Amino acid sequence: MNIGFKEDLTIEFKSDKNKLPDSDLVDAVVAFANTNGGDIYLGIEDDGEITGLHKSHQDITQLAAFIANKTVPPIAVRAEKSEDKQYLKISVPKSRSIVASSSGKIQRRRIKADGTPENVPMYPHEIASRLSDLSLLDYSSLCVPDAKYSDLDPVERERLRSIIRMNPQGEQN
């Protein structure tokens, strides 16, 4: 039996025939939370074939609690079994901060050249960009080491002064 749709940036299938390792599930949740959120279908192969849940993943309350305990900050997922109880849909919200696994692993999702999704590490240089996307970091407010007054464009300084003067709510100094 096939689920009838494919994986994309917000949908991931995870096989659970031989019990998906807990770390793989947590990494997938972290990647979704650090991208746009989405749904993880546990008990479904990459080709969409429904192969069923392992007995250790039958308790959805326990699974949701486990995920919250293994993510930093804790991610509250919503887990629901299919009507035939053969697979689990785990809905992961988009996080308003950067999320890591409790072991310190930070992941994100992306689309490969062939159009299929994958989870990849989020490297330190990508963290500032992600924080900016979340409106948590303003690059213009960062200090520039060794900058001097003479580095600033005098025309732009005068343009800024003019804008400030025209704003009746702004300071006049």
Residue ranges, per PLM feature:
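Conserved N-terminal catalytic/coupling substructures associated with nucleotide/phosphate chemistry
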Residues: 1-173
